[in-house]
A protein has these predicted regions:
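A conserved FAD-binding loop/helix module that cradles the flavin
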Residues: 159-183
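Flavin-binding catalytic cores
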Residues: 11-12, 38-48, 82-121
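Mid-domain catalytic core of redox enzymes
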Residues: 1-65
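Conserved FAD/dinucleotide-binding core of flavoprotein oxidoreductases
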Residues: 7-9, 66-93
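Hydrophobic, well-ordered secondary-structure elements that form the walls
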Residues: 6, 74, 94, 156, ...
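A glycine-rich dinucleotide-binding beta-alpha-beta segment and adjacent secondary-structure elements
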Residues: 49-53, 100-164
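Short glycine/proline-enriched loop/turn "hinge" motifs that connect secondary-structure elements
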Residues: 62-69, 147-151
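A generic secondary-structure signal for well-formed alpha-helical elements
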Residues: 10, 98, 181-185
């Protein structure tokens, strides 16, 4: 994953009014463009027109930015461990759907896959999902258990993108871990 955090002078100037009201926007273009981007990553190449996830929480939480300003974070898929700087491609992709987006940028912080792994050793190669997401892996972390949120230590539970239902289903890992803990009370 290649991630950029932004400080903006105002909200993202989306062409679509619906995007201006969404906490998260998936920017991909046509189905063919999305498929081409993901195929490039699978082949070990940086995508020309990346599939970009855009999170604009300051629209709903005013404590995330000073009055009149906004924060934003974005990411796109890149090959495992890639050192390619996707800033230009990622911002160009956003500008296709939000003209003059770059004019709103006050500051940016770029995180490459290597930096993401340095930040969190579970993000091997920049993979925010904690590695392989197949059925076997989901039920064998950290040990083989019927309830993947429990640990061998009584009363200790865990959740992350490495537990079911996996990354991209925000909050559900924590919800299921809490349910498992409550059942054991």
């Amino acid at each position: 994953m290649f991630k950029i955090d932004y400080a903006l002078d105002g909200p993202v100037p989306w062409k679509s009014e619906e995007c201006s009201r969404a906490g998260t926007v998936h920017v991909g273009g046509t189905l063919a463009e999305i498929a081409a981007a993901e195929l490039a990553v699978w082949r070990g190449e940086p995508p020309e027109k990346p599939f970009v996830l855009v999170a604009q929480q300051s629209l709903f939480d005013s404590t995330r930015a000073p009055a009149g300003k906004h924060t934003l974070w974005t990411y796109c898929h890149v090959p495992n461990g890639s050192s390619f700087d996707m800033t230009e491609r990622l911002e160009s992709q956003i500008e296709r759907f939000a003209p003059d987006f770059r004019d709103r940028i006050l500051a940016r912080h770029v995180s490459t896959p290597v930096e993401l792994e340095r930040y969190n050793t579970n993000y091997v190669g920049g993979d925010i999902n904690g590695g392989v997401q197949d059925l076997w892996q989901l039920y064998t972390r950290p040990t083989i258990r019927l309830v993947p949120y429990s640990t061998p230590a009584r009363g200790i539970y865990f959740c992350s993108s490495s537990t079911p239902p996996g990354g991209g289903v925000h909050g559900m890992c924590g919800y299921f871990a809490a349910q498992a803990a409550l059942r054991d009370l």
